[in-house]
Amino acid sequence: MENLYALILGIIEGLTEFLPISSTGHMILGTTILGIDIDEFWKSFLIIIQLGSILAVIFVFWRKLFQGLDIWLKLAVGFFPTGVIGLFVAKYLNALFNGWVVVGMLIFGGVVFILIELAHKNKQYRINSLEEISFKQAFCIGIFQSLAMIPGTSRSGASIIGGLLLGFNRKVAAEFSFLLAIPTMIIATAYSIYKEPELLSNANSLIPLGIGFITAFIVAVLVIKFFLKFISKFDFIPFGIYRIILGFVFFYLYYSGILNAGSEFKL
């Protein structure tokens, strides 16, 4: 059963990590539906399978990553505000670990996506390639990304919204968001392990860890490629609508008492 749970959670991680729909929210649903008690092993599992998603980004974008130093400098600049803000506010984030915050941010983010797309319907995008992104714009995207520290926001959603507001076309906004995930998720994972080194010692079931990691990697590769093709033809409004629907699903689950807005949120 443990291996089946690992497979399902790996699929959820790969499906939701890079779509602007909140991977945290879907992990809450997934672990609750499966009846998983989030003990020390599963905490380790959820951290380690994120590395599979990171590897997927490197796999898909390796040519762009190794074209030169410029993209790495922009990613460093983009990560800087996220890292600094994270250091200062990390100890205060526990106050936000509440299901009602997830509900609010899911719905709010969905509305923002819809409004931005409607406002940009007839506008020309100014930034149409990664090379055109300035260091100032990369820094601003990092500020937007830091909003993802609020549960339910979605890291990719926050950074994509930032890109759209700065005049990036949809594909460039998504690509830079995916690439910015590399330093962000690696350092966030390393920080989690630094804070709780016992997480690695708890990762003693190699088979489910391997299943989750490989599944997250494969699914994330497919999702990234699909998503980039999708947004080259369509806008983000479907994702906005989905977020709003999911937000109301969570509202019902918390309001009815099916989910506990406090304890079950802390994965």
Curated annotation (Swiss-Prot):
It comes from the Bacteria. GO terms for cellular component: plasma membrane. GO terms for molecular function: undecaprenyl-diphosphatase activity. The keyword Coiled coil does not apply. Pfam families: BacA. HAMAP family: Undec_diphosphatase. Belongs to the UppP family. Bacitracin is thought to be involved in the inhibition of peptidoglycan synthesis by sequestering undecaprenyl diphosphate, thereby reducing the pool of lipid carrier available. This is Undecaprenyl-diphosphatase. It comes from Campylobacter jejuni subsp. jejuni serotype O:23/36 (strain 81-176).
